[in-house]
Amino acid sequence: KMKLLNEILGTKYPIIQGGMANIATGEFAAACSNAGALGLIGSGGMDADSLRENIRRCRALTDKPFGVNIMLMHPQADEFAKIVVEEGVKLVTTGAGNPGKYMAAWKAAGITVIPVVAAAILAKHLEPLGIDAVIAEGTESGGHVGEMTTMALVPQVVDAVHVPVIAAGGIADGRGLAAALALGACGVQVGTCLLASTECPIHENYKAALLKARDSDTIVTGRIGGTPVRVLKNRMSREYVRQEKAGADKMALERFTLGSLRKAVFDGDTENGSLMAGQAAGLLHEVRPVEEIFAAMVSEAKDCIAGVYKEITL
């Protein structure tokens, strides 16, 4: 029997809340953990003191498991790697790089390490480091993306490694969870569907833009420059793509987008802010508590799997 993610992590549901930069605070991670998933603090957009403070706030608000996401290209990644050990964090997910140089210290501290990958070859490369599981994230996801779709990526990662695989990208309801399990994943990581939650600390304008979004309302910026990011279409993202196609240099584009995520998250500027969101935004129709989102996802997945099982007579 395949072990589900909740058995591996000690959570009620086989679901991880994505560690979204400037969004996944200690409070939000605690709310998701208390609702039965694994809450993650997103260290992107934080400095060392802020990360430490968020870990402590999270711990004060939940007695359930939680973790920290570290983007390895963050200028303070080395410092963050030490802080998670000092603060007794039990789980770390990593993105944008190789966590190899931190593994000895993390493993000595008993930390569960789960990297996010966008290709099977990377998962295979990281497995010998002693990782505990891997998140295979498809291009449907919001924020920084790879090229492969979740449906093509997940089974190839499952075949490439011996550790449990968690699916991410384009999953926003029970149908997505059921599909991920059918592809061989042990659970899912979700982000976009949680932006439309009562507890999510983003501006109400950002939530309203998400609820209005349809299936074709996201765009990937930064493909030419090598830092592809999926966001909702708006004035900023269209202008970015126009400048990029016109040959603007990397520094000019960085200046253009400086602070754009904060504009969206904190100021609610839906035209000049970076509204990071995945293609599943079109599935969001109302703002609900995270507890309701997770419970509905698992209940629907069970019904979905039972229904498919009943229909198939091979």
Language-model segments: what does each one mean?
Residues 23, 171-172:
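Residue-level detector of alpha-helix initiation sites
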Residues 1-164:
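Active-site entrance/lid segments in N-terminal catalytic domains of soluble metabolic enzymes
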Residues 152-166, 172-314:
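Conserved active-site-proximal phosphate/metal-binding subdomains
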